[in-house]
C-alpha cells in the first residue's frame, strides 16, 4: 500500500531532546511548517528555526504550570481530521491539518527510579497531552505520521526525500504501531508503580512502595521468531525487555552461526547466568538447562578442559559459556574436541571467530562484560496464572557460613564447598554437586529424592574415572534424612555444604560426624524448578 501523504505541517513536543534539532532542521529545510510547545519550541527558536508556539496557534495560553498545553480542538482537530471528509468543518473552525506529530513523553520511569522520589514528583511526571496527541495521530495514521522514537528520524527524512516530501501508508501504519506500543508501555509503567503503592497509600503498610502491584502489566519487544518452540509442533518467538540493564542472552549479539532455536536460548541463558557467579576465569557447559561441567582456573582454556572432563558424554551438543574473552586457543580446543551448539562469552578475538567459522553449525554469541547483577523479577507461567518472584541473587559469603560438625573443613575443602555451592544454585532441584579443586566431578540433577541425586553424582564421577575421595558436596536444599550423607560418605566425600533447616538436622549432623565429614550450613536455600 503506497498511499502517500505529503508532510507540510509538523507538531514537535518532546521531553527527550536527542536528535530533535537536526530532525527539525531537516523538516524545515524541506518546507515543513513547525508547531511546538514549551521547552521544545524555545530550543528550536534558539537554533534559528521558524517555529510557531502552539499557544499562538490556538489563541489559548499554556496554563496550570504546563498541565494544559495541547488539549485543544485546533490541535486535535488538526490531527484527527480526515482528509477529504472533514475538510469543510476544519476550514469553518480555522483548523489547520497537522501531518506529522513528533512526541515523546515525560520521563516517568526515570523520575520514580530516583531515590527519594515523592508521590507529588511522580504525579507531575504523568504526561497527559503527549499520550493524547500520540493516540490521536496513531488512530488517524491514514493521514498523519506519528513519531515517538528518535531512532526513526533519519529513516523518515530519507523516505520523504525519496517520495517528494511524502510518507507511504505502510510507513505511517508501522509508526502508529510503535506509537500504541509506546503509550501502552507508558501507561503500564504508571499502573504498576501506583498499583504497588496501594497498601502504603491506605495506611496498611509502612513501606513506601510494595514489590508487586495489584495488576501486573508487562511489555516485551519481539526480537525474533523461532522456527519452532521447545518441540517441533509448537510455535514460538523470543521477546526481550526494552531496556535490559545487564549483559544477558537478551542483549547478546550473534556473530556467527545459524539462527538460535528456542532451546538454544533457554540453555544459553542457564549457562551464562551460572558463569556470572564466578570471578576467576570460568567455563560452564550446559545441557537441557542443567550444568554438566563447571570449572574455574587461571585461564579459560584450562577451565574448559576441566569442565569438559566432568561429563564428556553430556557435553556433546551442549552450550558453553565463559566469563572472559574467547581466544583462539580455547576455540580450537572446543572445535577439535566436541560438537557444540552455542558458545557465549563477553567477547571473542578475530582469530577465535576464524576458527569457529570452520564449523557453520556453531553459533557464537558475545554479550559484553557484566559488572554487577541487577535485581529484577522472575516469572513462571502456570495454567491460568503467573508466579512472580524476585530474582535469586542471594549468595552467602564465607563469613556467613556455619560449621555444624565436630570436624572443621580444611582450607581446600572450604574452597571446594563454596565453589560447588555456587554451581548447585543453577542445577535443577533436587540438586547435588560434587567438586574437587575448583571443578565439578559429578552432578545429580532433577531427581525426586535427594538421595538419588547424591547417588547419581557419584555414579557420574565413577563413570568418568574422577576421584571423589576428599571432595566437597553441595545440596541446594536441606537433607530430610541421613541417607544422602551416607551415600556421599560411601564414595569418599569429606565435606558437605547445605542450607540446613530440616527437623532431622541433628540426625544428619550426627551422620556427618560418624563419617568424619565436615558439614557447613549456609542458612540459604536455592531451589530451582
From Swiss-Prot:
Transmembrane segments: none annotated. It catalyses: (6R)-10-formyltetrahydrofolate + 5-amino-1-(5-phospho-beta-D-ribosyl)imidazole-4-carboxamide = 5-formamido-1-(5-phospho-D-ribosyl)imidazole-4-carboxamide + (6S)-5,6,7,8-tetrahydrofolate; IMP + H2O = 5-formamido-1-(5-phospho-D-ribosyl)imidazole-4-carboxamide. Residues 1-148 form the MGS-like domain. One of its GO terms (cellular component) is cytosol. It comes from the Bacteria. The keyword Iron does not apply. Its EC number is 2.1.2.3, 3.5.4.10. GO terms for biological process: 'de novo' IMP biosynthetic process. Disulfide bonds: none annotated. SMART domains: AICARFT_IMPCHas, MGS. The keyword Transferase applies. It holds the Pfam family AICARFT_IMPCHas. Belongs to the PurH family. NCBIfam families: PRK00881.1 (NF002049), purH (TIGR00355). HAMAP family: PurH. This is Bifunctional purine biosynthesis protein PurH.
